[in-house]
C-alpha cells in the first residue's frame, strides 16, 4: 500500500503495524430516506354529502351539496352539485359546482388536472377559479418526501461512527455510519429554527462538533429543487350561481427554485387579453431568527401599468407562530380574476 496520505506506525508492544487510511479510501455511503411510490388503487368510488335545513315564520329552506367521485390506479374523477329547494332570483335550483379529472405521476411528483380548479396562490395575488388544464409539481401529498430545506449532513469518517443532529439542544436525529464519505437525509419531521449542532463520535470516543444557525421552513425549497405549475383555461365567475359562466382565456406560469439553504427565488406570470401580471418572488431565512417573504409585481390593464409590493416577516415557535405582513398597491394595479370595477386597498397591514 502506497500513498502520500497513508500513514504507518509500528507498535512494538503489540507486534503490529498500524495503518491510517483517510476516508477517501472507503466506499462512499448515501443514507437516503426510503421513499416508496403509492400503490395503485383498485377501482372504487365515494360519495360526500351535506344537507342544510331551516324553517321560520316566513320561509323554509332545504339545501343539499353532494360530491361524487370514482378512482382507479392513479387517476380520480369527481363531480360536485348543489341543490336549492328555494333558490333566489337568478339562481338555479340544480347547480353543477365543479367537475375535475386528476392524474398523478407519483414517481415524478407531478399532477395533471383537467376541469374546474383554482390557481396557485402567492402573497400578492389571490387564487381564482377557472376551467382548464393545470400541470405541475405535487409535493405536499407525499409526506415521505422532503421538499423543504432540511440540512443534509455530509462529511467523512475513518472509523465506524455515530452522527447526531441537535437543534436548540434537543437531539432530533441519530444515525450510525460506516467509514468513508457519508451523506445523510435527516427526514421529514423537523420544522424548526435556532442553533444547530452536528456531533460525530467514532467508536474510540473521539468527537467532532460543528455548530451553525438554521431556519427550517416548508416555504424554503431544498437546494436545487424546482416547484412549478403551468395552467391555461378560462376564468370562472359566479360559480355559486351559474355553472357555465366561463369568460376570459388566460395562461399562467408559476415557478420557484431553492437556490441556497436559506434562499428560494421564483416568479409568477399570467396573461390574458385584458390583464397581464408578472411578480418576482423571494423567500429568505434570516439567520435563525425569522422568515422573510417578499414579492414585487407589475400589471398591465388595457395599457395602464400598475405596481405592487408585499413583505412578510414570520417566526414559528413550534406551538405558536408570529407574523407581520404589509402590502402596497398603486391605483392602476389590477389582478387577473378581478372584475373591472374591483379595486385593491392601497395599503394593508396585518
Annotated model-derived regions:
Residues 223-255:
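Compositionally biased low-complexity segments at domain edges in trafficked proteins
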Residues 87-89, 239-242, 266-267:
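A generic structural signal for short coil/turn motifs at secondary-structure boundaries
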Residues 264-269, 293-295:
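Short catalytic-loop micro-motif centered on adjacent basic/acidic residues
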Residues 1-226, 235, 279-350:
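Outer-membrane beta-barrel channel domains
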Residues 242-246, 270, 301:
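Alpha-helix capping and helix-loop boundary segments enriched in small/acidic/polar residues
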